[in-house]
Regions:
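A short, structure-level motif marking secondary-structure boundaries and short turns
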Residues: 1-2, 43
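A detector for short, charged/polar N-terminal pre-domain segments
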Residues: 2-14
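A positively charged, amphipathic N-terminal helix/segment that binds anionic biomolecules
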Residues: 4-6, 60-71
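A basic, amphipathic helix-loop patch mediating RNA/tRNA/ribosome contacts
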Residues: 14-57
Length: 71
């Protein structure tokens, strides 16, 4: 597992799919949708299959071997 990545967001929340793109762990929205719908993305330890899930600073998103800390 690689070191956690801090991902600063400019608003109070960001959609899960947008966060994956912003962090650079997926190439585009289609890939974000695919991995989220496959059930391989977790928010705060729980699998979430909703691309529009709102995440906020303090949330931790995991995908494959990446850990994203929303800041």
């Amino acid at each position: 597992m690689s070191a956690p990545i801090d991902v600063p967001i400019r608003d109070e929340t960001i959609r899960l799919g947008q966060l994956l793109k912003l962090a650079g762990v997926v190439d585009d929205g289609a890939m974000a949708r695919e991995v989220i719908e496959r059930g391989v993305v977790a928010v705060n330890g729980e699998i979430d299959t909703r691309r529009g899930r709102q995440v906020r600073p303090g949330d931790v998103v995991t995908f494959e071997d990446e850990t994203l800390n929303v800041t």
